[in-house]
Amino acid sequence: MGLFLPTTKKELELRGWDYVDVILFSGDAYVDHPSFGVAVIGRTLEAAGYRVAIVPQPDWHGDYRDFTKLGRPRLFFGISPGCMDSMVNKYTAARRLRSEDAYSPDGRHDKRPEYPTIVYTKILKQLYPDVPVILGGIEASLRRLTHYDYWQDRLRPSILVDSGADMITYGMGEKVTLELARRIAEGENISDITDLPQTVFLTKTDAIPGGITDRDIVLHSHQECLRSKRAEAENYRHIEEQSNMMHAQRLIQETLPQPLPLREKGKYPQEGISTKEVSSPLPYRERLGESLYVVVNPPYPPLTTEELDASFDLPYTRLPHPKYKGHRIPAYDMIRHSVNIHRGCFGGCAFCTISAHQGKFVVCRSKESILKEVRQVTQMDDFRGYLSDLGGPSANMYGMKGRNQKACEKCRRPSCIHPLICPNLNTSHQALLDIYRAVDALPGVKKSFIGSGVRYDLLLYRGNDEAANRSAEEYTRELICHHVSGRLKVAPEHTSDRVLMLMRKPPFRQFQQFKRIFDRINREEGLRQQIIPYFISSHPGCREEDMAELAALTKDMDFQLEQVQDFTPTPMTIATETWYTGLDPYTLQPVSSAHTPQEKLAQRQYFFWYKPEERPALERSLRRIGRADLIPRLFGTQPHNSQPSHYSHPSHDNYRADPRPQKPGKEKRGRNRRHP
């Protein structure tokens, strides 16, 4: 394991450096671990011979000394908001400030501004106007084109316009960042680098490289999208398809830099610097009012196993920087003893951003690389023999890909398993079983748990490959018997097949089938494990009647739900575009959604049917929607004699709105704790 990348002038001097090639600014605390993107990019550049420094969570107030303490980099500044979109990280679905920031020391939520991508860029461009600023990370990736911002309740243009940065490197950034650094180091001007895959830049119409050709997809302009929600919906279909193609086309969208309207005081969260300052384009970029075009170059092909191994095999310390000694970083606590074994997800869930950021093609690490990292974990002072997770974006997609790759190269489907599992997909779980067994055989490993989400539709699928079918059965039993820490969490998300179709999730009967298998194996093996389902309310297409049925069905299955959340519209998902536009981007048919707090609360209340204090409001709601027949099914035949009470919003403040995973095996406490 190597030293930490330098974060201060003193640390530069200890290395004998009198300059730095690249300075990375991050909205997260600096944790030198392959699950933290800034550490990955920093180590990747370091391995290529560049001098790299990191400034984690700079103070954006006052004299900006954190932005000047390391001086001017030789090549460029890189900016990442952190592992999550800053607004998802900071606010709940109800636009309330979260109680803690999991990626900050001691969970403090005052260590990063809103939209750090914008705030950091503007400060750096003010201080160093001639130094390129490159945006990376999920916030910039998912805001690379016109997008709906839930927290401001309006369409925003590409974050390049709002920030004044020079370029976005979207998606997983190792390869593109290395190539960009090489070209700038060789003397190319950032404004001349317009052909680099997986980058986004702004240009005038007469400067679009090669001009607009038949190979390009020209999207509706930002101004058209402001006028027409249909235009925005039509755009998104192209964006999603191209994000999931092996050989994508270039996307071009006209945009118009202009000051954006001031928000009403107190109506929405306030950004770290003034709204006027954030929203106005910078004068160095182009004069106000001149039309510019956002150009999104197609991505690189997926990494090879060898390239992915190289990224994970870099000399990470796997620890928070020593500056945080005595402070707890909650997100690190969750992953300190976990190992990521693949990237990408072909699930294509409507509310998920993974395919837009990592793509649908699964890239796997080699067994040797995985075992090497597990051995490192076993040497950690606080390791007691239990790995918290061997997984990835999904627990059981390791080693899966299309049998005929030529067919995959032409495919436009955003999901390989919805609405039906593609017959070309190799669904064998054998490679994953081999990984589990090899890990569990290592000295020092007592047990490896699976904390990532399990796709039970892949476990239930029976195709023409009998070996793959047998491996799914074998995996199911091994998972339940040896890799569950008492509670297996899965995500049916809803019970209505109509809503599930919009979510791109399998029918609810598959969850019921999987639960029967889970219960049977528990009986056969003498286990007393629980299956914990996740559910979402207020997803586009979901009606109050659907939530009433959800309450009745889950009650019949003896669940008292705890892992629940309200749908949060986040940039660049089909669910968000449907929620905002009211249209399905693929069919352009209308889809209704719950928008107001009252409409959302009316749906969310059904999660908590088992709480006596909620019964009066639920009975009134069931009668109002014409489903009084569900009252005896939920509450029995005994009438409720208490006086009607006004339904109180704070009674649901503790529902699970946080999309971040909990530590595997951790018992939920408080009002949503499952009763024995």
Regions found by a protein language model. Give the residues of each.
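Flexible, glycine-rich loop/tail regions that form catalytic "lids" or insertion modules at the edges
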Residues: L14, V22-S26, T68, L196-T199, ...
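N-terminal pre-triad scaffold of radical SAM enzymes
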Residues: F25-D28, K325-T353, Y386
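Glycine-rich beta-alpha loop elements in corrinoid/cobalamin-binding modules
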Residues: G37, P56-I252, L288-E290
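Flexible glycine/acidic-rich beta-alpha junction loops that bind and position SAM and/or redox cofactors
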Residues: D85-A94, L142-R144, E174-E179, F361, ...
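Terminal amphipathic helices with adjacent charged low-complexity linkers/tails
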Residues: H61, S191-D214, H222-N244, Y300-L303, ...
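Conserved SAM/AdoMet-binding glycine-rich loop
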Residues: L24, V40, I54, W60, ...
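N-terminal [4Fe-4S]-dependent radical SAM core
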Residues: G2-Y19, A29, N244, R250-I252, ...
